[in-house]
Swiss-Prot record:
Keywords: Mitochondrion, NAD, Oxidoreductase, Transit peptide
Localization per record: Mitochondrion
Record-level GO cellular component terms: chloroplast; mitochondrion
SUPFAM superfamilies xref list: Formate/glycerate dehydrogenase catalytic domain-like (SSF52283), NAD(P)-binding Rossmann-fold domains (SSF51735)
Coiled-coil spans in chain: none
Residue range covered by the transit peptide: 1-25
Name of this protein: Formate dehydrogenase, mitochondrial
Binding sites annotated in the UniProt record for substrate: I125, N149
PROSITE patterns listed in its UniProt record: D_2_HYDROXYACID_DH_1 (PS00065), D_2_HYDROXYACID_DH_2 (PS00670), D_2_HYDROXYACID_DH_3 (PS00671)
Positions marked as site (Important for catalytic activity): R287, H335
Designated gene of the protein: FDH1
Main function: Catalyzes the NAD(+)-dependent oxidation of formate to carbon dioxide. Involved in the cell stress response. Involved in formate-dependent oxygen uptake coupled to ATP synthesis.
């Protein structure tokens, strides 16, 4: 079965002092499953668009399908604290579905409590809300809908770059406030053409962003663990930079497109930010925890970072007193870039497809696996 591990692993578990994985295999059986989905509550907005599938009310549009097959589908937005609704279902759920936009943090402690849990699905891209090492050790499968919102995020990143470069937000605020002061905007508004833009990470989203930046005649750089083939580099017009800090020192604009891992958590700390050009613009739609929160605030206050934009925070939802809400020259939003209606349709369909394969004992598309057979996907190692 796609969700089970290889027989040799099960044999090792029999003789192991801790047979958590083997026990889970014994409990896994055909029949109805308890599936829990954690999504944000949309309230009055839930009924405004029939394709608004990513909210708790519409629950990916799969309730009728799941229940027609005899499965139980519990949906809740309540995910934090020992008395939350999610916690009540942890002991006996088989599948947990979450999104990056309202993540259910699956800790090692929760994994230990979830004796029936077999599958963790991310409706979207990015499964860092799961303790992946604990999931691997427990024999769980973790998968996401790879590619479902790459276009959405890349388009959003381009928008944020332009908002920062053109100093758009202060002008917009002037209109709202009944003001008119061209000089207050123009003194720090620039063209994108001719600027050096570097992406930290050039996977699916990073490459799409570089492709969309090419017509702007920028100097395009990228840093990644893997170099693109020469033909693709030439098509995009981007140059590979093996040394991250050397690339960063050249950039007028830095875009973060790397997953959150143990290696990238806090990657942009005070020391690294100090190596950036004074007046650099940063766009981060990857993960908030890649940045040192206070270091970003300090650099924005000093002017070393001239503008910071993104839709990712740590934690999420961001508390009302999160310092990024109040730092100067920021163009922050809630986590929205990857949850356009088009993206919701794609990741809802992808989630349904994986559930269907899971029920049938079939493998998922290989690129969707984040944890399989006790192994993490390369980008998370």
């Amino acid at each position: 079965m796609a969700m089970s591990r290889v027989a040799s692993t099960a044999a090792r578990a029999i003789t192991s002092p801790s047979s958590l994985v083997f026990t889970r295999e014994l409990q896994a059986s055909p029949g109805p499953k308890k599936i829990v989905g954690v999504f944000y509550k949309a309230n009055e907005y839930a009924e405004m668009n029939p394709n608004f599938l990513g909210c708790a009310e519409n629950a990916l549009g799969i309730r009728e399908w799941l229940e027609s097959k005899g499965h139980q589908y519990i949906v809740t937005p309540d995910k934090e604290g020992p008395d939350c609704e999610l916690e009540k279902h942890i002991p006996d759920l088989h599948v947990l579905i979450s999104t990056p936009f309202h993540p259910a943090y699956v800790t090692a402690e929760r994994i230990k409590k979830a004796k029936n849990l077999q599958l963790l699905l991310t409706a979207g891209i990015g499964s860092d809300h799961v303790d992946l090492k604990a999931a691997a050790a427990a024999g769980l499968t973790v998968a996401e809908v790879t590619g479902s919102n790459t276009v959405s995020v890349a388009e959003d990143e381009l928008m944020r770059i332009l908002i920062l470069v053109r100093n758009f937000l202060p002008g917009h605020h002037q209109v709202i406030n009944g003001e008119w002061n061209v000089a207050a905007i123009a003194h720090r508004a620039y063209d994108l053409e001719g600027k050096t833009v570097g992406t930290v990470g050039a996977g699916r989203i990073g490459r799409l962003l570089l492709q969309r930046l090419k017509p702007f005649n920028c100097n395009l750089l990228y840093h990644d663990r893997l170099k693109m083939d020469s033909e693709l580099e030439n098509q995009i017009g981007a140059k590979f930079e093996e040394d991250l800090d050397k690339m960063l020192s050249k950039c007028d604009i830095v875009v973060i497109n790397t997953p959150l891992t143990e290696k990238t958590k806090g990657m942009f700390d005070k020391e690294r930010i100090a190596k950036l050009k004074k007046g650099v613009l940063i766009v981060n739609n990857a993960r908030g925890a890649i940045m040192d929160t206070q270091a970003v605030v300090d650099a924005c206050n000093s002017g070393h970072i001239a503008g910071y934009s993104g839709d990712v925070w740590y934690p999420q939802p961001a508390p009302k007193d999160h310092p990024w809400r109040y730092m100067p020259n920021q163009a922050m939003t809630p986590h929205i870039s990857g949850t356009t209606i088009d993206a919701q349709l794609r990741y809802a369909a992808g989630t349904k497809d994986m559930l269907d394969r899971y029920f049938k004992g079939e493998d998922f598309p290989a690129e969707n696996y984040i944890v399989k057979d006790g192994e993490l996907a390369p980008q998370y190692r």
